[in-house]
A protein has these predicted regions:
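Pre-recognition alpha-helix immediately N-terminal to the DNA-recognition helix
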Residues: 33, 60-64, 124, 151
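C-terminal regulatory/oligomerization modules of transcriptional regulators
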Residues: 1-22, 147-172
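Short, locally clustered residues in the helix-turn-helix/winged-helix DNA-binding domain
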Residues: 35, 63-70, 130, 157
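N-terminal leader segment of winged-helix/HTH proteins
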Residues: 1-52
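Charged, amphipathic alpha-helical coiled-coil/dimerization segments
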Residues: 94-151
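N-terminal helix-turn-helix DNA-binding core of bacterial DNA-binding proteins
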Residues: 25, 39, 43-85
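Short, hydrophobic-biased segments on the C-terminal half of alpha helices
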Residues: 75, 93-94
């Protein structure tokens, strides 16, 4: 999460740029605004999910499984699809099974493998949640035209391509 509520002013950014060699005020302002907005969106998203008794991880599992609700899947496939470790996935699955939102069974030919399926209760929860979710996303993006939304996606894809520069050791 990014908790900086009081962002620097234009003059403060300019002052920082004079003090620090690689500080580009425009880039930093854009990145700080993106971090703050993304953090605020995630906070709102988590509050909405909490009303349905879900965390982001549990929601993502249900959403991915809902793409093909009649097709069983495995914990390892789900872990890859939502970007968590298998250990994290085990905890998320245990909670969803306990709440009756998914079922866990054994693979027909390989008893070592687990098969996971959405239950009727899980489908029912999604039927209640998803219209609310879609409506909130529509309102979130309501200030943009469809063309602006497409431009935003294109710009965010460009920013996403630069994420490795946050973690590499050299400053190329």
């Amino acid at each position: 999460m990014f908790y900086l509520l009081d962002q620097p002013t234009r003059n403060e950014f300019q002052s920082l740029a004079r003090r620090y060699e690689n500080m580009d005020p425009s880039s930093v302002k854009a990145a700080v605004t993106l971090l703050k907005t993304g953090s605020d969106i995630l906070t709102g998203f988590e509050k909405m999910l909490k009303r349905y008794g879900l965390s982001q991880g549990r929601f993502l599992i249900l959403i991915v499984m809902n793409r093909q609700p009649d097709k069983p899947t495995s914990p390892s496939i789900l872990a890859k699809q939502i970007g968590v470790t298998r250990a994290t996935m085990t905890g998320l699955i245990d909670g969803l099974v306990k709440d009756g939102l998914i079922s866990r069974g054994r693979h027909g030919h390989d008893r070592r493998k687990q098969e996971l399926k959405l239950t009727g209760k899980g489908m029912g929860l999604l039927e209640d949640l998803l219209p609310d979710y879609w409506s909130r996303l529509r309102k979130l993006m309501g200030g943009l035209t469809h063309q602006e939304e497409e431009t935003l996606v294109s710009l965010l894809n460009k920013v996403d391509a630069g994420i490795p520069f946050l973690t590499i050791d050299n400053q190329g």
